[in-house]
Regions:
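Conserved segment of the helicase C-terminal RecA-like domain
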Residues: 344-370
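Walker A/P-loop NTP-binding motif
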Residues: 54-58, 74-88, 111
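Post-DEXD/H (motif II) to motif III coupling segment of the RecA-like Helicase ATP-binding lobe
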Residues: 159-222
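Conserved helicase ATPase core of P-loop NTP-dependent helicases/translocases
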Residues: 132, 280-282, 288-310
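Conserved pre-motif I regulatory segment
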Residues: 23-65
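Conserved nucleic-acid-binding Ia/Ib motif block in the N-terminal RecA-like helicase ATPase lobe
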Residues: 89-151, 162, 280-283
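Conserved interdomain hinge at the start of the Helicase C-terminal
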Residues: 228-273
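A short beta-strand element within the Helicase C-terminal
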Residues: 318-330, 353-355
Length: 461
């Protein structure tokens, strides 16, 4: 039976698509789950993820509240992906996120799950034509920011008949930054939706009525990690606190962390001061081009940058490694952002410390409370990071894998295993962490070499 472009898929197939995901046997699901967790390098799910899985096995409405960094993405994505219909060639699951970074992060998680289902992320900051080219071959899972997804739906860019599940990830953040009308439109334009999942890392959030939840199951894990976080204050004799910041970084030594500022101008001033002291760092703020923000996060994840200087854009919804600390160079104006910033460290079961830089004549807001004082020890400046980042001009669309990139560096490049760091594979390129000391001998051996059928350039980022 042929499909009419105007009328959508035939009713028989739509009915099958609505039923088939829920006919999957438990034994098959468990087997697939074990394979996925193995690919992700995860031994077992944490209590929050297990609870989410149990709720989604019997309920169509879930509100999942859990701190940043506790694995919410896998908590909802794993059971939803295991329920996808392998026979359906249209979009089945839509995930709405407040930021480009979170869209890219979730897309990467799903690719690493190795399910065989196609996934695409769409977001502002890149051409709509690129989106249309990518989703012409339909993904099973579409991830995107509210504005971009709403735009594609209004244009009727794809069939919505098979979209039965919508996730509003960090929904309160999307509302906070002004996406309510787009979110309303998305839900209105997806009439087939049966399962709705909302996630947040904020306590006391209000569920918007337009989502249309009837009897949601609420999982609240927001109190689970308070004991893992230490918050301390560091007094500063001067109002600009720059000298105190450098003393604190020297005191902390070679650890990784985020320094939060409230304003882009302050970030520039602090960045200049850190550069004067040869303290390597990346910058992450809303005023930057998307490609620059992505590269800053890549270099932070692979250790090229031990520090990230950021606005509250980095307080949630970005993929960063385990952090030893965060520093409030400026305190946020609201308690919620204070909590989200602190949530970047002491994630899962790890320890972490949030430091508040306080000018001695400055009164701390009530939401901070009484804090113990951290006494700074005199120490030399931290040594520069031993890592650098290389750009490889070939990626997933060229059928290149992480193993191919590693093989190039080990075989042709004669690189020692301990000198190769994190490899991040993108659609059309790859980024590789490499020990700086090995670069001079490595680069001439690996650039202009073939990976699969493509000759790639390898350059220093």
């Amino acid at each position: 039976m042929e499909r009419s472009a105007s009328k959508g898929p035939p009713k028989e197939k739509a009915s099958l698509a609505r039923q088939k995901p829920y006919l999957c046997s438990m034994s098959t699901r468990v087997k697939n789950q074990a394979e996925i967790l193995s690919k992700l390098g995860i031994a077992q799910l944490n209590p929050m993820q297990l609870a989410a899985q149990q709720v989604l096995a019997s309920s169509k409405e879930l509100v999942l509240l859990s701190p940043t960094g506790t694995g919410k993405t896998l908590g909802f994505l794993l059971p939803l992906v295991l329920a996808l219909d392998t026979a359906c060639d249209e979009i089945q699951l839509v995930i709405i996120v407040p930021s480009r970074e979170l869209a890219i992060q979730i897309e990467q998680v799903m690719r690493e799950m190795g399910t065989g289902f196609k996934v695409n992320a769409v977001y502002g900051g890149r051409s709509g034509s690129k989106d249309r080219i990518e989703i012409k071959h339909r993904p099973a899972v579409l991830i995107g920011t509210p504005g971009r997804v709403a735009d594609h739906l209004r244009r009727e860019a794809f069939d919505t008949t098979f979209i039965q599940t919508v996730v509003l990830d960090e929904f309160d953040k999307s509302l906070e930054i002004g996406f309510e009308s787009e979110m309303r439109d998305i839900l209105h334009l997806l009439p087939q939706v049966r399962t709705k999942i909302l996630t947040s890392a904020t306590q006391g959030v209000t569920i918007p009525s337009f989502v249309g939840l009837k009897s949601p199951q609420v999982l609240d894990f927001l109190e689970d990690k308070i004991s893992q976080l230490h918050i301390k204050k560091v007094p500063s004799p001067t109002k600009d606190k720059l000298d105190t910041l450098v003393q604190l970084l020297s005191h902390l030594g070679a650890q990784n962390g985020i320094i939060f500022c409230n304003f882009k101008d302050s970030i520039e001033r602090v960045s200049d001061y850190l550069n004067e002291h040869n303290l390597s760092h990346g910058i992450f703020s809303g005023g930057m081009e998307q490609i620059d923000r992505e590269r800053a996060l890549i270099k932070f994840r692979n250790g090229t940058y031990p520090l990230l200087l950021a606005t509250d854009l980095a307080a949630r919804g970005i993929d960063v490694p385990e952090l030893n600390f965060i520093i409030h160079y400026h305190l946020p104006l609201r308690a919620e952002e204070f909590i989200h910033r602190n949530g970047r460290t002491a994630r899962m079961n790890s320890q972490g410390t949030a430091y508040v830089l306080q000018y001695e004549k400055e009164a701390l807001p009530d939401f901070v409370g009484q804090l113990p004082v951290e006494t700074l020890k005199r120490a030399p400046l931290p040594a520069p990071s031993p890592w650098s980042t290389l750009f490889v001009s070939g990626g997933r669309k060229d059928k290149i894998s992480k193993g191919d990139v590693a093989g190039l560096f080990f075989k042709q490049g004669m690189l020692a295993k301990e000198d190769l760091g994190i490899i991040e594979l993108k659609t059309d390129c790859a980024f590789v962490g490499v020990k700086t000391a090995a670069l001079e001998q490595l680069l001439p051996k690996v650039t202009n070499q073939k990976l699969k059928e493509k000759k790639v350039r390898v350059t220093l980022v």
